[in-house]
């Protein structure tokens, strides 16, 4: 945001329903609902061609948005992008006891690496996620894509970036792997790398 302000580029950011300052309960959120949030911002607030930057689940959302609005999205930058995480990194990793519990109670609490309290995963999140999986078939993208992923990410394996590159139909897909980088990529060097990626993409598609 500071970089965009400094160079005079328009910038929009938002919290999904149930996140940050937005209303709603996190446990009521689903990939589909957050996709609707993304399209509402893209259609109702952001004007003109857009470069989307998404981190983790936001990376899944940017890919969905680019597929839904190909005429609006001219570039994508993913940071530890996590498409299909509800299926590949949650459901398929749950043991039988966890699967039985979430199916019976509708919610499962998992330990968090970032908070003292566990975070909730709803059955609705898992089931709805199956309607939005992207890595099982070719993913139609008509714009440049730059994926940045830390190689010691313990939440989303770096191989996910390669999977995205493999299914994306765009001829312009690049992957930057950060040796020693974790999931959040929030160190000063990581932010400088992201800033450079944003500026390079902006110059490439806009200027």
What residue spans do the PLM features occupy?
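Catalytic histidine neighborhood in serine/cysteine hydrolases
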Residues: 168-184
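Short beta-strand/loop motif that positions the catalytic acidic residue
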Residues: 140-141, 147-149, 153
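Conserved alpha/beta-hydrolase
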Residues: 1-23
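Alpha/beta-hydrolase fold nucleophile elbow
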Residues: 45-56
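Conserved alpha/beta-hydrolase "acid-adjacent" motif
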Residues: 154-160, 186
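Hydrolase active-site cap/lid region
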Residues: 71-121
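Catalytic nucleophile-loop/oxyanion-hole region of alpha/beta-hydrolase
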Residues: 19-47
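Catalytic active-site module of serine/aspartate enzymes centered on a nucleophile-bearing elbow/loop
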Residues: 181-207
């Amino acid at each position: 945001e500071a970089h965009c302000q400094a160079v005079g580029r328009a910038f929009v950011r938002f919290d999904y329903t149930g996140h940050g300052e937005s209303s709603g309960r996190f446990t009521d959120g689903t990939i589909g609902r957050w996709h609707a949030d993304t399209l509402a911002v893209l259609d109702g607030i952001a004007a003109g061609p857009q470069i989307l930057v998404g981190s983790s689940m936001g990376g899944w959302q940017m890919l969905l948005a680019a597929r839904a609005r190909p005429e609006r999205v001219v570039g994508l930058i993913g940071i530890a992008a996590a498409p299909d995480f509800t299926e590949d990194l949650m459901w398929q990793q749950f043991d039988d006891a966890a699967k039985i519990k979430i199916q019976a109670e509708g919610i499962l609490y998992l330990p968090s690496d970032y908070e003292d309290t566990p975070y909730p995963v709803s059955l609705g999140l898992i089931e709805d996620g199956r309607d939005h999986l992207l890595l099982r078939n070719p993913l139609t993208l008509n714009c440049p894509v730059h994926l940045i992923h830390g190689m010691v990410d313990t939440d989303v394996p770096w191989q996910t970036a390669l999977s995205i590159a493999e299914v994306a139909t765009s001829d312009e897909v690049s992957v930057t792997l950060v040796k020693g980088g974790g999931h959040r990529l929030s160190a000063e060097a990581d932010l400088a790398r992201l800033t450079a990626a944003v500026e390079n993409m902006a110059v490439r598609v806009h200027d």
